[in-house]
Amino acid sequence: MNKLIFKEENVIMELLFLGTGAADWNISKRVDGEFFRRFSSALVDDALLIDPGPHIFDFAEKNGTPELYRNVRSVAVTHSHGDHLNAESVKRLAAAGGLTVYCDPAVEKKLRDAGVGGVDFVPLTPFESVTTPDGYEIIPCRSNHGPYLPGENTLNFIIKKGDRSFFYGLDSGWIMYDTWLRIKKERPNAVVFECTLGFCPGDDRMFGHTGIPMIEIMLETMRAQHGPADDAKYYTSHMAMTLHGTHEELVRQLAPLDVTPAYDGMRIRV
């Protein structure tokens, strides 16, 4: 289904973090000059957008790049929550024509019900890969997250191009076992964990989100079992404002794990 064959090798992808915050960041209370995280979203090579949330155009405007999404013809949606999916953002992206949205069928219905038109929808089934016209292979993996729409599979993604790939693991609590098996098979060159919780013992959000102690446990297994590539780089996104201190504190907390917390506007090469 919509699968093309590409034989590129040694393709380096660039991932731009458009937002790195969880849903408790209030953009209406942002203070100019103070550190702020938008809702989590990412852009691959200025071509593939992951999660068209309500803050993506604010990122472009505040950074003086109003044409940032000019070449975006593919959008991949992890799940239906409002900090990750915004119908008005999709409509603006679709205005130029030729937009394809890769998502769970329940997400497609939500967007259609919100009046999104002029878009090609490609339904995603966990672990059945699809390839965009630009040659990005999207491997949808099951995530451990909720609540969700009736019948919705919430997703994480492995994004591949050529022989390079990365795992985008938000939103999710403990990584699902079948998703772990696919990570071991693909051996991604980078992993983006979500880190909503920070250190929150006794917080039941751990059943759908991730904190630093959970990342430490999963990382130990990933490295011991040679899941991601041996030289893989590890990052975090989706940090809650109310469950973390400063970004500098988070840098220090994650340093012993050799994990880098992302910030809005950060670029990495995969």
What is each residue range found by the language model?
Residues 103-155, 160-162, 259-268:
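Metallo-beta-lactamase
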Residues 23-80, 86-92, 177-183:
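Pre-active-site segment of Zn-dependent metallo-hydrolases
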Residues 14-20, 49-51, 136-144, 165-172:
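Active-site-proximal beta-strand elements of phosphoester/diester hydrolases
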Residues 175-269:
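Cap/insert and terminal regions of metallo-dependent hydrolase folds
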Residues 64-125:
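Active-site HxH/HxHxD metal-binding segment of metal-dependent hydrolases
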Residues 2-12:
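Short, Lys/Arg-enriched N-terminal segments with co-localized hydrophobic residues
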Residues 49-53, 71-83, 87, 102-105, ...:
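Active-site neighborhood of phospho(di)ester-bond hydrolases with catalytic His/Asp-centered motifs
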Residues 46-48, 95-100, 165-166:
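Short active-site oxyanion
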